[in-house]
Amino acid sequence: MGQKVHPNGIRLGIVKAWNSTWYANTKEFADNLDSDFKVRQFLTKELAKASVSRIVIERPAKSIRVTIHTARPGIVIGKKGEDVEKLRKVVADIAGVPAQINIAEVRKPELDAKLVADSIISQLERRVMFRRAMKRAVQNAMRLGAKGIKVEVSGRLGGAEIARTEWYREGRVPLHTLRADIDYNTSEAHTTYGVIGVKVWIFKGEILGGMAAVEQPEPAAQPKKQQRKGRK
């Protein structure tokens, strides 16, 4: 049987960036890793309804900077920034260093593998037919410009006695092309029949130029020059 390598892991440092970017010596490494895990665990649980795609953690000069990628930034920020301030205090307590929280909006949630998987599990938990949920996710992604998408669900589908796996694919999903920008993520639906696993692969196109092309910042908008009165 052909086994699949993790699509994100194989592309790290080629076209994918790490979710935690920091350096530490041997003594500090384990503590940093443990606090990263606890921060992610806390934020994922606290922001379960905020459509969080990914959490990026950086550690500049004895502090921690957390960037939350979400499709619903208003829920994370709260009224006048109250909620995000509460989160910042808890993150600072967990990490033991001053914390800063940034919010990044996911503009197209239909093209984000984690949000697509979460959308499918919420439908499965509401007893929507799994084929309908899969097909809807695939159609939405292709309509918004995905080059290809594959969705796989496994478990006691439709309450069947024997668990099975079903998948649906549209377009191209090249798993071996390292320069391919493939967004992959998983999620679990907890139904009355048991747990149903959902996997989503979304192919967004090829990235030429490696990490330099990925990390290149967008050019800032230049202010328009104002014409002086009386001059043409």
Swiss-Prot record:
HAMAP family under this entry? Ribosomal_uS3_B
Stated name of the protein: Small ribosomal subunit protein uS3
Q: Which segment of the chain is annotated as a signal peptide?
A: none
| Gene Ontology MF annotations | mRNA binding; rRNA binding; structural constituent of ribosome
Under the heading SUPFAM superfamilies, the entry gives: Prokaryotic type KH domain (KH-domain type II), Ribosomal protein S3 C-terminal domain
Which family is this protein grouped under?
Belongs to the universal ribosomal protein uS3 family.
Name one cellular component (GO) term.
cytosolic small ribosomal subunit
Location of the KH type-2 domain: 39-107
Q: Which UniProt keywords apply?
A: Ribonucleoprotein, Ribosomal protein, RNA-binding, rRNA-binding
What is its biological role? Binds the lower part of the 30S subunit head. Binds mRNA in the 70S ribosome, positioning it for translation.
Classification via InterPro entries:
KH_dom, KH_dom-like_a/b, KH_dom_type_2, KH_sf_prok-type, Ribosomal_S3_C_sf, Ribosomal_uS3_bac-typ, Ribosomal_uS3_C, Ribosomal_uS3_CS
Q: Which Pfam families match?
A: KH_2, Ribosomal_S3_C
Q: Which GO terms describe its biological process?
A: translation
From which source organism is this entry? Yersinia pestis bv. Antiqua (strain Antiqua)
Subunit and partners: Part of the 30S ribosomal subunit. Forms a tight complex with proteins S10 and S14.
